[in-house]
Amino acid sequence: MKEVPTEFVPWNDESEVKDLHRFEIGLYPIPANEWSLGKSSLKALTYMAIGIPFVATAYGTNYRIMQHGVQGFMALTNEEWKESIIKLIDDVDMRRRMGLAGRKTVEDLYSVKSNFPKYLQVFETVASQ
């Protein structure tokens, strides 16, 4: 594998979004165990909201929020992780397409705008009781 420039950026709640905008590829490794079944896939949703293609562990709620090969890749074995990361490194157009697909997924399914009718219905139902 060719050398890829990397930079470690410590997490900072004040600069997180700005820092993420510098990413070209996101990584979301979680252990495939019972504890991880309680995870919410928020990291994957964050990557998608910002338009970052990513590789995530093929486990838990990741199956519900993303499609393998559309917004990013899912991997379980070391070989799958390696192959997925290399594909994203080598294909700028794929990264762009996946980033756009991720952003569209968040806008269509998870945004306030797309969920407003559901919220409104709940509030109207509660208010009428």
Where are these regions (language model features)?
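Short loop/helix-cap segments at secondary-structure boundaries that form the rim of catalytic
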Residues: 1-4, 65-67
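Nucleotide-sugar-dependent
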Residues: 13-46, 56-64
